Regions:
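A conserved ligand/cofactor-binding region detector
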Residues: 1-767
Length: 767
């Protein structure tokens, strides 16, 4: 059925007569129909008893799906042309689509890329998560501060399909009935898998107060699936997080066991063979309770042969089935929960967790590997490592640090469990969709194979000295910058100069990612311009980031950036040469506009703190040059492109780890003994800035940088300035810069999530 037929059937109108919203709904129906047909064909060919991966994650930052699905189904060109013939534009149609608010940062975006690659590689694998009604929050700036509002994204017509699947979930004093919603995951010329999102029918979207995100955290039946990462700065918030996590894994366990029970019966096997039919990938520690929950079910419900497993047997079965991905080196992000909180929310799991801990204590004397510590806190990662068969980091450096530092006690016990799987991104969304001009030009140069085999991009290297190719790549970049400038003017009311250098830092706001260092550079540059040192090319510094509601210093950093933006915009001496923009409510849709237009990609986390990063890969693929520390996947980018095609600076991870061990880093010494550093830091509390900001916020941040600076901003600041100035100077030689751009795109193939998923499958899942 064509779009015209669907429009006629649904609205009794031609495409031309329909509104953009109506055409979007028609396209939604078209895509759902095509995916349904593909699923039916797939099911006819498929072995019902095949092994399947279940990817459990608290976040899936999937982005808008219309164009992505059309590209993956091979319909994008055909649909675009049909719309164009009828006076419609697919980009404008896509504006009618709300972005699902099911994730926040890199963790959720990685999960989305992985689902895309699992389907593209024709692997049998589904995602499992929660159907958050209001997401993290919608960010609005008011008086140069972040404010948080509910993000109502679920519409009557959406990619969500309500199913009849329901499971009972029992908490301590409460039981709820879940409801499963599905989103189809289309692979590029591949299969269709599913993202299963669990919800409750009693959730109440009206309970947030005053258009903010404060609500009664105790009304579990009304709030359970409202928000991603509800504020956990108080006891009620922490309990709600435990409710959410158990809700997710209880549903996951029931779904997995029901599917595997059917497969076992067909194969004449019992659930003690679970690992032959399922592999469960635990994405960070949020889904950890799936391990004790599976053990609970396996020891309380009879197996197919009528037997009941012992605790030991069930633990062995689960250990052979579960694999854990670690995403962090930050101690604060390795989740621990007070045992008495678990006793309140999930009392049925506590005896199992105690049993698992006793097992560990019987085998090992090192208390650092115990599950329950001396303060009666339960270490979720410890459960994953002891009772899973694989533990992977997400970049070479990250995995090394886990094995040698953070998790070395575990590595000594289980060296065979540890492995690295460097993260990747889906090139369908992050090149074919968001940078269509560049993708088309690459196809013109090297053919279409790179769309399925990203390593083919390396063929571009043969054009590194071809002036015409370099000129065209620079031209595409300039077009993308103009497009971004027009979009920012239209959507945000912000005017930016497309002739300026676009220097972009977009990621979750956290002190270790060091947006504060970039802000201090802006202050340095402001002083330089005021002193008459005018840059050859104007610079536009673009930030995009949300700060967790209760993360005070992160919100102070946003306040500083917004104040600097206003100060500079109002200064006629500086504004022609320097612009600071912070995009509101940064999300996947905004990333798709920013990344193709970027010149300098800011990846400036403190070395040893960023597990991998994936923004760095997206920018690299689209021809931005990385300005970064030797952290996460930056290390692998540097190895691939060579030192002449990346701008690196800063203390090494070994040096940083040594500073922490020796407790010998003192920000105050650097501040007091370096005039330039002192001048930049003190500007945070200057009268000039205070006229645009709040003295309390600015003073608190100023004090934090001088007295704590836990992530060593001042340690790397001067070298950061030096290397950034070098990058800006190099930008003037357009041909040389264009060559560096081409080399970055050519070497990006390694960072395809298809490569990552092939490695997961070869080494861990074995589907």
């Amino acid at each position: 059925m064509s779009i015209a037929e669907i429009c006629n059937k649904m609205y009794g109108k031609t495409i031309r007569e329909c509104s953009n919203e109506q055409v979007y709904t028609a396209l939604l129906a078209l895509v759902k129909k095509v995916t349904e047909e593909r699923k039916e064909a797939q099911e006819r060919q498929e072995k019902e008893n095949g092994k399947k991966v279940y990817y459990i994650s608290a976040e899936f930052l999937i982005g808008k799906l219309l164009s992505n699905n059309l590209i993956n189904l091979g319909l994008y060109e055909q649909v675009s042309q049909e719309l164009e013939k009828n006076g419609k534009n697919i980009v404008q149609i896509e504006e009618a689509e709300p972005e699902p608010s099911l994730g926040n940062g890199g963790l959720g975006r990685l999960a989305a890329c992985f689902l895309d690659s699992i389907a593209t590689l024709n692997l049998n694998g589904d995602g499992i998560g929660i159907n958050y009604h209001l997401g993290l929050f919608r960010q609005v700036f008011a008086q140069n501060k972040q404010t948080e509002h509910p993000d109502y994204w679920i519409q009557k017509e959406s990619w969500l399909t309500k199913t009849e699947v329901q499971y009972p979930v029992q908490f301590g004093k409460l039981s709820v009935m879940s409801r499963m919603y599905d989103i189809d995951v289309t692979g590029y010329e591949g299969r269709v898998n599913k993202l299963h999102l669990f919800d409750i029918d009693t959730v109440d979207e009206k309970i947030p107060m005053h258009d903010g995100i404060d609500f009664d955290k105790n009304a579990i039946e009304k709030n359970l699936t409202l928000f991603l990462y509800p504020d956990d700065s108080d006891r009620a918030g922490q309990l709600l997080r435990i409710y959410q996590q158990y809700f997710m894994v209880s549903n996951a366990a029931q779904l997995i066991l029901s599917e595997c029970r059917r497969k076992c019966e067909k194969a004449g096997k019992a659930l003690k063979n679970l690992n032959e039919f399922a592999v469960i990938q635990i994405n960070d520690t949020h889904p950890t309770m799936v391990i004790p929950e599976l053990i609970r079910i396996l020891t309380t419900q009879k197996d197919i042969d009528g037997s009941l497993m012992t605790m030991q047997e069930a633990a062995e079965v689960v250990t052979k089935t579960c694999a854990y991905t670690n995403h962090t080196i930050l101690a604060e992000a390795l989740e621990t929960w007070p045992l008495d909180y678990l006793e309140e929310v999930v009392p049925q799991l506590v005896p199992i967790i105690r049993y698992l801990d006793e097992n560990v204590r019987a085998r090992y004397t090192d208390s650092s590997v115990y599950i329950i510590d001396e303060n009666d806190r339960v270490h979720m990662a410890h459960i994953d490592i002891h009772y899973g068969f694989s533990v992977n980091g997400v970049a070479k450096l990250h995995t090394e640090i886990l094995m040698q530092e953070e998790l070395k006690s575990f590595y000594r016990i289980y060296p065979e469990k540890f492995n690295n799987k460097t993260n990747g991104i889906t090139f369908r969304r992050w090149l074919l969709h968001c940078n269509q001009a560049l993708a088309a030009y690459i196809e013109e140069l090297i053919g279409a194979d790179f769309k399925k085999e990203a390593g083919e991009l390396s063929q571009l290297i043969k054009y590194a000295d071809d002036e015409n190719v370099i000129a065209r790549m620079l031209e595409i970049k300039a077009e993308n910058k103009k497009r971004l400038a027009a979009y920012m003017q239209e959507k945000c009311g912000v005017k930016i100069n497309p002739q300026s250098v676009f220097d972009i830092q977009v990621k979750r706001l956290h002190e270790y990612k060091r947006q504060q260092m970039n802000a201090l550079y802006v202050i340095y540059k402001y002083f330089e311009i005021k002193a008459g040192n005018i840059p050859d090319t104007p610079v536009t510094v673009i930030f995009g980031a949300k700060a967790a509601k209760a993360y005070t210093i992160a919100k102070d950093i946003i306040h500083l950036i917004l104040c600097l933006g206003e100060l500079i915009a109002n200064d006629p001496d500086v504004s022609p040469y320097l612009k600071v923009v912070m995009v509101e409510n940064y999300n996947v849709t905004m990333a798709e506009k920013l990344i193709p237009a970027c010149d300098i990609s800011e990846q400036i986390s403190l070395a040893s703190k960023e597990a991998s990063g994936t923004g760095n890969m997206k920018f690299m693929l689209n021809g931005a040059l990385t300005l970064g520390t030797f952290d996460g996947a930056n290390v692998e980018i540097a190895q691939l492109v060579g030192k002449d095609n990346i701008y690196t600076f800063g203390a090494s991870s070994d040096e940083v780890i040594a500073h922490y061990k020796n407790a010998d880093y003192c920000a105050k010494d650097l501040y007091e003994n370096d005039e330039m550093i002192k001048k930049c830091v003190d500007f945070i509390v200057s009268d000039e800035l205070k006229q645009y900001g709040d003295e309390e916020n600015l003073s608190r941040l100023h004090h934090e940088i001088i007295s704590k600076d836990w992530f060593m901003t001042l340690l790397d600041f001067k070298e950061y300035i030096k290397v950034k100035e070098q990058a800006l100077a190099d930008y003037k030689d357009r041909a040389a810069w264009g060559r560096k751009m081409l080399i970055n795109t050519a070497m990006a193939g390694f960072f395809s999530s298809d490569r990552t998923i092939r490695q997961y499958n070869t080494d861990i899942w074995k589907l």
